[in-house]
């Protein structure tokens, strides 16, 4: 949606009680995306350590799969916010 930023600015200017939360939500998407990416990197490291050190292969695999899901969600939020 190329016009989403313009609509948000228009709503903020005309109705601040509606527009300001929309503007805050728009900015928080990239912050949430970065947090998801950091958590996914942490899960990757935990999963690799679990897979390499102990015999808990199922737990390590779950951490790696969770990291891929969270990382994909983080990339999606950052991409949608910057487009």
Curated annotation (Swiss-Prot):
Keywords: Late protein, Membrane, Transmembrane, Transmembrane helix, Virion. Its main location: virion. The chain crosses the membrane at residues 31-51, 59-79. It comes from the Viruses. The keyword Membrane applies. It is found in: Virion membrane. Induction: Expressed in the late phase of the viral replicative cycle. GO terms for cellular component: membrane; virion membrane. Disulfide bonds: none annotated. Belongs to the asfivirus EP84R family. This is Transmembrane protein EP84R. It comes from African swine fever virus (isolate Tick/Malawi/Lil 20-1/1983) (ASFV). The lineage of its organism: Viruses, Varidnaviria, Bamfordvirae, Nucleocytoviricota, Pokkesviricetes.
